[in-house]
């Protein structure tokens, strides 16, 4: 499914066409200043390609924040137009709405080959289909209005390109409702689909999944789906304590214990056995007497267990040593979830050592993919983004793909 979608590279005839590009400019803006421009920079290859191919107008649409279907200047995309202007080295026309006669007229009047940024899609309740009214009450958009909004977006251009992988799991109007004949992925979306297709549909083996995160119950769907695909699985992070307590009757002190998740541990291990998947769990832990970077700490083995009133906050050195061979002999690695509370420097070592091993196996030619969210933040923090095959830009979207779900924004693209 992922590999057979039309992409921007397949489009031969863009010259003199108006192109509508759904991008992800959901960036943190404080007092009109953009705090992180990564998502804007990431769209430049798609925009520059369309300019080079002679597109008549390049019309960018995006959401930003959660204005809930109401106009809210806090979430205006105007500052993004300024940043984009600096990055492209040319004027970017900003329009203060994203649909309607005035927008259509201004697009048509704009100069050839120009870049136009429209205002936040989510200022219209029809984008998400729900929001709040002026009094803060929850409201739903009616079907006719949603249909009209989608038709109004469709009217703006001749070709549609979706480059917003981070929103691909949302069936919002701009993701699934543009009714143009040609709907292709941009370079960002294309790269995401290619890497996930390599890992999930046609992997080089052995295929390893490294999972972390707090709750087993949040990751059940993920674990079950990956057990159908992988050869090996490392289960670490907060959810490891639930596994260790259930499987080894280990004392876990005040470490995270997921009551609901604990009931499924047996079933997960049964499935792993049936599917011939090796499961690796930590065997030692860095523990603390408080959830605090400056807490007292010590290392314990799983045999010793964690004393009362202490909690496990990172994997210990023996665990990482055990993972070394597992990681370095894998040909494909999917990593979703850190091994400890890496946000606190004293409990980051397990995750950082794990990252270094993933970097090492990438150098040996393995394909390595980091799902969005916390693990991507860790890679960013350690400045290792260029040393991993692919760091996903979509937390929720990549998680749903790994869970085996189809993404509405991807399904809506044209097939090759």
Swiss-Prot record:
Protein name: Phosphoglycerate kinase
Necessary cofactors: Mg(2+)
Quaternary structure, from the entry: Monomer.
Pathway(s) of this molecule: Carbohydrate degradation; glycolysis; pyruvate from D-glyceraldehyde 3-phosphate: step 2/5
Species annotation: Plasmodium falciparum (isolate 3D7)
Residues given in the record as ATP binding sites: 214-215, 219, 238, 312, 375
Residues reported to bind ADP: 213, 237, 342
PANTHER family: PHOSPHOGLYCERATE KINASE (PTHR11406:SF0)
Key words of the record: ATP-binding, Glycolysis, Kinase, Magnesium, Metal-binding, Nucleotide-binding, Transferase
Catalytic activity: (2R)-3-phosphoglycerate + ATP = (2R)-3-phospho-glyceroyl phosphate + ADP
GO biological process assignments: gluconeogenesis; glycolytic process
Residue positions binding Mg(2+): 214, 218, 374
């Amino acid at each position: 499914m992922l590999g057979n979608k039309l992409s921007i590279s397949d489009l031969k005839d863009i010259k003199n066409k108006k192109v509508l590009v759904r991008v992800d400019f959901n960036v943190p803006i404080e007092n009109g200043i953009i705090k992180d421009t990564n998502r804007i920079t990431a769209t430049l290859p798609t925009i520059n390609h369309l300019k080079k191919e002679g597109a008549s107008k390049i019309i960018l649409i995006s959401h930003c924040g959660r204005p809930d279907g109401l106009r809210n200047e806090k979430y205006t995309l105007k500052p993004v137009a300024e940043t984009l202007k600096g990055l492209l080295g040319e004027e970017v026309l900003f329009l203060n709405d994203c649909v309607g006669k005035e927008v259509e007229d201004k697009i048509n009047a704009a100069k050839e080959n120009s870049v136009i940024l429209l205002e936040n899609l989510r200022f219209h309740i029809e984008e998400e289909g729900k929001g709040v009214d002026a009094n803060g009450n929850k409201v739903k958009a009616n079907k006719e209005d949603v249909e009209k909004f989608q038709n109004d977006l469709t009217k703006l251009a001749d070709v549609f390109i979706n480059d917003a992988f981070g929103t691909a799991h949302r069936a919002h109007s701009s993701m699934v409702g543009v009714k143009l004949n040609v709907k292709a992925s941009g370079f960002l979306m294309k790269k995401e689909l290619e890497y996930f297709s390599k890992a999930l549909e046609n992997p080089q083996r052995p295929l390893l999944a490294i999972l972390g995160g707090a709750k087993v119950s949040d990751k059940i769907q993920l674990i079950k789906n990956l057990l159908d695909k992988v050869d090996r699985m490392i289960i670490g992070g907060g959810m490891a304590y639930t596994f260790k307590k259930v499987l080894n009757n280990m004392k876990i002190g005040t470490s995270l214990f997921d009551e609901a998740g604990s009931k499924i541990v047996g079933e997960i291990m049964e499935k792993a056995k049936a599917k011939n998947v090796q499961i690796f769990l930590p065997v030692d832990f860095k523990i603390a007497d408080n959830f605090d970077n400056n807490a007292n700490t010590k290392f314990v083995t799983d045999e010793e267990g964690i004393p009362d009133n202490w909690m496990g906050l990172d994997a210990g050195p023996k665990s990482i040593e055990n993972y070394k061979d597992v990681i370095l002999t894998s040909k494909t690695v999917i990593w979703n979830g850190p091994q400890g509370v890496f946000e606190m420097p004293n409990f980051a070592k397990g995750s950082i050592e794990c990252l270094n091993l993933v970097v090492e196996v990438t150098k040996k030619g393995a394909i390595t993919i980091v799902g969005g969210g916390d693990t991507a933040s860790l890679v960013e923090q350690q400045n290792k983004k260029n040393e991993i095959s692919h760091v996903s830009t979509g937390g929720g979207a990549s998680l749903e793909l790994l869970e085996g779900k189809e993404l509405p924004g991807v399904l809506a693209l044209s097939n090759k």
